From Swiss-Prot:
It comes from the Bacteria. It holds the Pfam family Ribosomal_L30. The keyword Protein biosynthesis does not apply. This is Large ribosomal subunit protein uL30. Keywords: Ribonucleoprotein, Ribosomal protein. GO terms for biological process: translation. The keyword Nucleus does not apply. InterPro entries: Ribo_uL30_ferredoxin-like_sf, Ribosomal_uL30_bac-type, Ribosomal_uL30_ferredoxin-like. The lineage of its organism: Bacteria, Pseudomonadati, Thermodesulfobacteriota, Desulfuromonadia, Geobacterales. Belongs to the universal ribosomal protein uL30 family. The gene is rpmD.
Length: 59
């Protein structure tokens, strides 16, 4: 469960609730189409679940 996840922001933060913006900023996704690679931990999986409609996840 320690493999990396490739996460890309595909929907703008404009109009999103403050909590969702905070989650995206916590993952380092601050611009549209930005991609980050994060470890597959329960914390990151929970963050992805909060903003699943705004991101694309690849293994």
């Amino acid at each position: 469960m320690s493999a990396g996840l490739k996460i890309t922001l595909i929907k703008s933060q404009i109009g999103a609730p403050t909590a969702q913006k905070a989650v995206l900023n916590g993952m380092g996704l601050n611009k549209l189409n930005k991609t980050v690679v994060l470890k597959n931990t329960p914390e990151i999986v929970g963050m992805i679940a909060k903003v699943s409609h705004m991101v694309k996840v690849e293994e």
